[in-house]
Amino acid sequence: MRSLALCLLLMLAGCDLFERRPVQTLHEDVRFTVGSPYQAGGVVRYPREAYGVDETGLATIAPDYHGLTADGEIFDQTLLAAGHRTLQLPAIVQVTNLENGRQITLRLNDRGPSSPARLIALTKRSAELLDIHHDGTRVRLQMIDAETRQLAASLQASGPTLAVAAAPQGKVEAETLAPPGGAPQSSRVRQAAATPAPANGTAPVVEALPRRLPERIVQFPAAPGRLYIAAGSFSRADYASILVNRLAFLGARLTTSYTASRDSAFQIRIGPFDTVAEAEAMLTRAIQAGVNDAAIVVE
């Protein structure tokens, strides 16, 4: 009986050690993926490959998860990574905490968050570097097109090429820069253009990106902005006016953006709102009114 109890204790101890062992390598099935439409939080999402992405919204911190991310990596809270509802995976982006001006570079490698009121789900390490300690922090996401294209090309051409060895983390680097040019745009997406083939017909040489991106913090002035509901964008004012009239009971109004792409020049906004709770409540009403792609933005 004593021997059986000892064996059980050893088995439990072994399981505990296994669960706490840090992940040091990637699963072999890391892949470029866009994915099919799916439903989350009562809203259907349509993943797409896009570049020139510049979005604002609210961040959350991803819960612990023992499994694979949407692009085939082993989920790891210590990586500079995050989940996004619709963008291609993996993708390299800059994320700025608009409430304190901190900016880091991370890799989108998973789907999420499930709530339609959140733009991005950060790993715990990403949240630490951005000094984010609560759900609903205002952030800006900007895709780094060159590195995202490089990563996509490497994975599509020859399969998994992320460097599987964990790079030394070293110390966190930080610097202070002047504010970025232009006010943050709530959503500015440009569809991918075809990449011209090399003149000699050979495949381009692409270098694998490390699994652990450098922990480098860039400090900008804080620019928390105000919360709005983005309820649609159109290339023509008359098209936008139809939806504005339909959402008049919510206080929708038509605005013109001179920095967004031509097909998003006429934008519908509801707000502003003083609190996240107020914005979330209005977002729910907008979705119930049939605007499935409505989102909370910061302007």
Residues of each region from the PLM?
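Sec-dependent bacterial lipoprotein signal peptides
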Residues: 1-15
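Secreted/periplasmic proteins
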Residues: 15-222, 233-235, 239, 298
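A short beta-strand micro-motif
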Residues: 95, 229-231, 268
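Extracytoplasmic
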Residues: 204-224, 233-299
